Amino acid sequence: MKSSMSFPRATALAGAAALAGLAAITVSPATAAPAKSSAAVSCSSTLKIAMVTPLTGGASFLGVEQLSWAKYAVKTLAPKLGLKIKLVTGDTPVEQGPAPAQTVAQKYVADKTVVGVIGPSTSGAVAASSKTYFQAGIAHVSPSATRTTLTKGDNQEATKAFFRVVPADDIQGPTDAKYMIDTLKVKNVVVIDFQEPYSLGLAGEVEKNLKAAGVTTSHQSIDNKVTDFSPYVTNVPAAADIVFFPTQKPGDAQAFASQLAEQGKKAKVFGGDGSNDSSAFKAAGSYVSNFAPDITGIPADASIIAGWKKDNPGKTVGSFGPPSYGATQVMLTAIKNACKAGKGKIVKRAAVIAAVRKVTIPNWILGGTFSWSKTDTNDPAGAKFYIFQIQSDGTYKLVG
């Protein structure tokens, strides 16, 4: 099956300010317990949910795509649920580290009409802000944060108010490594990290699985702000089959692949979900993995796709938008159920956390029925990753 989807997570670098952006649409009809809100909120009033994602900087394409699908979900689903919802946005540029995520979280904690958050979209932003949201009783449902230790392990970086609708890197890493071992028959792999949470977690999972299978590996650690990769390309062994390159900036994956070719190296780039952008990463023969299938092949999604395209003329269905629609659907359903339980009021924002945990969605946008894992990690049940190879025309073909 071929896919010509745009698979993004970051393109052009731009050093933008870390202030929370405010864009809105209005639609009419674990540990210690989270803190109570100061006052109940009437469900007949306009409630706010916040989309927290990179809208500027190198990963802006991620946020722009996610926001378009969250807007469409609010527009089409909120009236059916009898809700009046205003969608606001908070910008978390990946180049600026944890500060923007913390600033945005404090802003929305202070606004008592914000009853839920879609995001944060990146693992670093989740780690930086989840405690703040939890202490205020705010559920936050990410459509794309995959770092394993956000929800698993002895030192979890997120709280029980955090949920994600996509699988974690402990699924992505083994999936990527298994494909390299079983299908590509690799003998020598270079693994790179970019000294930030997303790449460190994914690189670690891949390297662990490759080593367990007896594959020769070497490791390079690159600052996330580096743009000239030539010294690192020089250090790629001539015998290397693959360079595993888990960036959040697909343009960097393209640059690295181009420099490999310029230096006569045979290795191909294999990116994680952060590299999925066919407009920026188009080096033929390279590979990417992603947590979303091509939803254009799911018959039940036809009307959703048609409606989204009508609202976004000329845009291509990508891999990051549909999970954002799904995360928004989960949040809206939880808000509706919390309102019902509170007899027309959200007595405390933490009621939405409890409601999120009980959500199931039939005819899920990514296929099948959505539900939470029974492992109490707030991860989705039965989720998987997909492998794509970049073709000579720049399209992404599903290969695993």
Regions from the language model: what does each represent?
Residues L22-A30:
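C-terminal segment of classical bacterial N-terminal signal peptides
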Residues A16-L22:
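Sec-dependent N-terminal signal peptides of Gram-positive bacterial secreted proteins and lipoproteins
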